[in-house]
């Protein structure tokens, strides 16, 4: 969770798309990013922790974590009072959308995807690639960079992708203190 905050923060501080964001807005978006996967609490553990590839049916269930997350946040009255509420709902719902419309849950394209969700999208993919999971070892930083830039993980906003390439070397520092990192 901390890495998503840090990666998002680094994007917000370095992307020309976010140059007019106030320090307060950058902090609110970074805090909201932490809740990107809150909807996974609605996904059965057998699917979340499955050591192998998900079946098409399981993947359809997994995809619901986006809408489930936004709905969960909207149902908590205290959340509505927080300054990052709208960002959190947008990020939870749209962080799996892709620039070319091949994401989910709505298949949005381009700037129809909220900017903060676009940023968390690439941050989440990078974190998932370079971190070990129950179903895979961590990829090397170099391999993760090549996969993202090469389009293996979907199509991202070209300006966000350019920022990612500029800051990727510094993103590695976020993981340098983790003793769990075992890169393949």
Write out the residue ranges for each language-model feature.
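Metal-dependent catalytic cores of enzymes that make or break cyclic nucleotides
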Residues: 1-184
């Amino acid at each position: 969770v901390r890495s998503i905050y840090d990666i998002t923060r680094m994007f917000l501080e370095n992307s020309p798309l976010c140059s007019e964001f106030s320090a307060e807005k950058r902090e609110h978006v970074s805090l909201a990013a932490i809740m990107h996967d809150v909807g996974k609490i609605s996904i059965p553990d057998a699917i979340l922790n499955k050591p192998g590839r998900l079946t098409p049916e399981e993947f359809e269930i997994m995809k619901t974590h986006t809408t489930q997350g936004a709905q969960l946040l909207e149902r908590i009255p205290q959340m509505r009072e927080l300054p990052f509420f709208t960002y959190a709902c947008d990020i939870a719902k749209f962080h799996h959308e892709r620039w070319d419309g091949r994401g989910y849950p709505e298949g949005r394209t381009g700037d129809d995807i909220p900017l903060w969700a676009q940023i968390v999208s690439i941050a989440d993919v990078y974190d998932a690639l370079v971190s070990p999971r129950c179903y895979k070892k961590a990829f090397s930083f170099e391999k993760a960079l090549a996969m993202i830039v090469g389009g293996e993980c979907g199509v991202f906003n070209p300006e966000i992708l350019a920022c990612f390439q500029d800051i990727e070397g510094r993103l590695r520092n976020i993981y340098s203190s983790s003793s769990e990192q075992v890169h393949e």
